[in-house]
């Protein structure tokens, strides 16, 4: 009998110890994180305006965290593949993903079994792109106000090019049309090189794009009507923003970092703090400036709120345009 009691007590003690040990590793992992290299997956090709600043950021973060942060390129599908990866990635903080704006459109354009708001753990927003609207230098349209006036006087006749249908540039131009009560005619191109040549060749009246237009503006071949950031471009300080013109649009297609759902909050906080320090270093700002970009910081809570609000806004625009796909 005594032996049975001893065995029972020993079994209870072992079970209790096992429970304690099960809880301890998670706590210890969070406290000692990171203990091995971190993968940072981005949705665009190597050598571009997204990739190059990310590599500077990763190098900065490596020095802060004491472990290598390795950038991995996973291009395709409009930049959404890294976020998709997070749905099957262990929530241990060792694989992170860049989130691009097209991720927020997925519920309305593609059949998916996950939620971009609920099924990603938002860490930090890092930066945004520079966008603007250009016309040929010899266009009779000389200001943004004249651009809108022309569209009102000529419904559906004012054409604009973008890098493609359902891109941020396309949807922002349609948001602009909705806000101003006008109708544009959209011409999608395969990229900014193609759209620039179409504009310079007189095949389209205007183009909304990233600063592929910048050298042509500086050469006097194109006229920049507006930029879309929170404040004026340092490179083109005489050009107004849509916001200051009273149009009420700020669009920089912000992007940042996420971890898989279920990642320990302590690990998320460590990652946030490290990448915040990394993005505050001068070399990161300099790497962005080469592409007319600037840091755009949001903490974890702000970034998650931004994601929730953006998903709702994208839904309204996509449904208004009749572009939503049946799920």
From Swiss-Prot:
PTM entry text: Predicted to be exported by the Tat system. The position of the signal peptide cleavage has not been experimentally proven.
Entry annotated with the keyword Nucleotidyltransferase: no
Keywords from the named record: Periplasm, Signal
PANTHER family reported in the protein's UniProt record: BLR1237 PROTEIN, TRICARBOXYLATE-BINDING PROTEIN
Cellular compartments annotated: Periplasm
GO-annotated cellular components: periplasmic space
Organism this protein belongs to: Cupriavidus necator (Alcaligenes eutrophus)
Protein name in the entry: UPF0065 protein in gbd 5'region
Family named by the database record: Belongs to the UPF0065 (bug) family.
Cited Gene3D superfamilies: Bordetella uptake gene, domain 1, Periplasmic binding protein-like II
Residues of the signal peptide: 1-30
């Amino acid at each position: 009998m005594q032996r049975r009691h001893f065995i029972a007590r020993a079994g209870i003690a072992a079970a209790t110890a096992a429970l304690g040990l099960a809880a301890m590793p998670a706590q210890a992992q969070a406290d000692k994180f990171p203990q091995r290299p971190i993968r940072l997956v981005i949705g665009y090709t190597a050598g571009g305006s997204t990739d190059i600043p990310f590599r500077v950021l990763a190098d900065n973060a490596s020095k802060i965290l004491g472990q290598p942060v390795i950038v991995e390129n996973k291009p395709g599908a409009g930049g959404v593949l890294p976020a998709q990866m997070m749905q099957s990635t262990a929530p241990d903080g060792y694989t992170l993903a860049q989130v691009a704006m097209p991720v927020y459109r997925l519920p309305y354009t593609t059949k998916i079994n996950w939620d971009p708001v609920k099924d990603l753990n938002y860490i930090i927003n890092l930066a945004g792109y520079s966008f603007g609207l250009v016309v040929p230098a010899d266009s009779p349209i000389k200001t943004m106000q004249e651009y809108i006036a022309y569209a009102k006087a000529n419904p559906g006749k004012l054409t604009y090019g973008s890098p493609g249908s359902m891109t941020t540039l396309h949807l922002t131009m349609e948001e602009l049309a909705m806000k101003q009560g006008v109708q544009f005619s959209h011409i999608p191109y395969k990229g900014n090189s193609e759209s620039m040549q179409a504009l310079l060749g007189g095949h389209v009246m205007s183009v909304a794009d990233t600063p592929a237009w910048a050298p042509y503006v500086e050469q006097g071949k194109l006229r920049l009507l507006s930029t879309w950031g929170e404040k004026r471009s340092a490179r083109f300080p005489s050009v107004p923003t849509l916001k200051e013109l009273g149009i009420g649009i700020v669009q920089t297609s912000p992007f940042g970092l996420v971890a898989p759902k279920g990642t320990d909050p302590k690990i998320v906080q460590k990652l946030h703090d490290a990448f915040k320090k990394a993005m505050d270093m001068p070399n990161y700002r300099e790497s962005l400036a080469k592409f007319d970009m600037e840091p755009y910081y949001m903490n974890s809570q702000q970034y998650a709120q931004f994601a929730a609000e953006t998903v709702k806004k994208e839904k309204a625009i996509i449904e208004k345009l009749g572009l939503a796909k049946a799920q």
